[in-house]
């Protein structure tokens, strides 16, 4: 338990930051899930639209420190490859 004023303030800040990060991570995962559902349905048009919406969200999460930028790039790349494979 925090005793000093500064420690109590840091506890509040951490709780606030954690809530924001949880929200951003959830938002990113929701967009990724929409792409994966579209891929599973086999509809390339819908999957491509979902991917175009998800890519900025994933990169924004990387910019905000939710995921590493290489992790974000890898997610986008793999999703794009899966969307492209639908046509083949």
Curated annotation (Swiss-Prot):
SUPFAM superfamilies: Ribosomal protein S20. GO terms for molecular function: small ribosomal subunit rRNA binding; structural constituent of ribosome. Keywords: Ribonucleoprotein, Ribosomal protein, RNA-binding, rRNA-binding. Belongs to the bacterial ribosomal protein bS20 family. It comes from the Bacteria. Binds directly to 16S ribosomal RNA. This is Small ribosomal subunit protein bS20. It comes from Methylorubrum extorquens (strain PA1). Pfam families: Ribosomal_S20p. GO terms for cellular component: cytosol; small ribosomal subunit. GO terms for biological process: translation.
């Amino acid at each position: 338990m925090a005793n000093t004023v500064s420690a109590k303030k840091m506890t509040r800040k951490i709780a606030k930051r954690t809530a924001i990060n949880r929200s951003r991570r959830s938002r990113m995962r929701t967009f990724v899930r929409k792409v994966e559902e579209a891929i599973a349905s086999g509809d390339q048009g819908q999957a491509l639209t979902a991917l175009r919406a998800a890519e900025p969200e994933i990169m924004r999460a990387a910019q905000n420190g939710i995921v590493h930028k290489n992790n974000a790039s890898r997610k986008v790349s793999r999703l794009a490859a899966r969307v492209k494979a639908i046509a083949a």
